[in-house]
Amino acid sequence: MSNENRTCSFCGKSKSHVKHLIEGENAFICDECVSNCIEILHEDGNDGTPSESAGGEPEESGKLPTPAEIVANLNDHVIGQEQAKKALAVSVYNHYKRLRHPKAGANVELSKSNILLIGPTGSGKTLLAQSLARKLDVPFVMADATTLTEAGYVGEDVEQIITKLLGKCDFDVEKAQRGIVYIDEIDKISRKSDNPSITRDVSGEGVQQALLKLIEGTVASVPPQGGRKHPNQEFINVDTTNILFICGGAFAGLEKVIRQRTEKGGIGFGASVHSKDENADITKLFGIVEPEDLIKFGLIPELIGRLPVIATLEELDEDALINILTEPKNALVKQYQALFGMENVELEFEEGALRSIARQAMERKTGARGLRSIVERCLLDTMYRLPDLKGLKKVVVGKAVIEEGREPELVFES
């Protein structure tokens, strides 16, 4: 169609009768029709901009759960760790409250409440972070700090974390910029001493510096659809300022650093006395950790400064592990009972068996993470034969199954 013959698809006026004729895909609209559309929208009370609440802030869908509601939800998935849950709930609530009311703190700059979780392997650090993201319905991604390298080195550079986060929300930049990133094993990239390194450190201090930029807020350039970077390519820009970062680690050996700070040492009446329960000692020491201890451990001061909320998790004892096996909504015992139920077979774990499973996990020092492998091992042969065992009504797992490797008791219909 020639320029002279083009007409507005709405009013039919030709280009010569209007000031502007805007071209779209197989359609045109003139400036007069655009003005009419704007007037109609204003009359309906909708000018196309986000609606504002009484406080003048853009409203967001859904009610922000209170700290108490967040903790109640975490209790459904994670056993114990009450102090850590409370610290997480308050920090996360304040973070998203700040995002929902950007003008409320116009006179005061509200900083981000990134979180550092310190606790032994299998104590629930990862599960807490996952459960938080699920409750808040925000994009969530996990990264292993030990796999990260500085940009320019072989390996996964820190910006790929943002690529993964974008992938979790179908490359919706707005959603990604309000997501949660959990970085595990942060303690494994500590530098060897608290003195700055004069050499290149591909997987330690250098990675901390790269993470620092991401955590404190930067615009990360991400390849579209998660491809690899190459010249002459358009990038997606993601502002990490409002992404909540949760870092976690076991920090094995940190207790020694804290002891050096808190105890004078020596012999005689001034000597320090340690409890026979080493786990209780470590839990108490982690509870009084200071930023200077983390610096001595090997984290750079700038990174610690960007992780203002420090929450410590306790070593799980035998009773806590038994509760983990049976109490949460997705408890391991409930999962296996559901699997057996699909074959119309009841699965029962005796109290002695549960205690033995918990004890073995403690001996292996794997915490809750090691429970599944123990249960899987004791039920493997039974699950292999299960579809072919006609008339089977019930499977009973006793103490001897766990401790002596015996077969579970099989109860058939009479």
Curated annotation (Swiss-Prot):
Gene Ontology CC entries for this record: HslUV protease complex
Keyword annotations of the record: ATP-binding, Chaperone, Metal-binding, Nucleotide-binding, Zinc
Annotated spans, Disordered: 44-65
Annotated binding of Zn(2+), by residue: C8, C11, C30, C33
Domain ClpX-type ZB: 1-49
GO biological process assignments: cell division; proteolysis involved in protein catabolic process
One Gene Ontology molecular-function label: zinc ion binding
Pfam family, one: ClpB_D2-small
Annotated residues for binding of ATP: P120, T121, G122, S123, G124, K125, T126, L127
Top-level lineage group: Bacteria
Function, as annotated: ATP-dependent specificity component of the Clp protease. It directs the protease to specific substrates. Can perform chaperone functions in the absence of ClpP.
Similarity comment: family membership: Belongs to the ClpX chaperone family.
PANTHER family: ATP-DEPENDENT CLP PROTEASE ATP-BINDING SUBUNIT CLPX-LIKE, MITOCHONDRIAL, ATP-DEPENDENT CLP PROTEASE ATP-BINDING SUBUNIT CLPX-LIKE, MITOCHONDRIAL-RELATED
Subunit: Component of the ClpX-ClpP complex. Forms a hexameric ring that, in the presence of ATP, binds to fourteen ClpP subunits assembled into a disk-like structure with a central cavity, resembling the structure of eukaryotic proteasomes.
Annotated protein name in UniProt: ATP-dependent Clp protease ATP-binding subunit ClpX
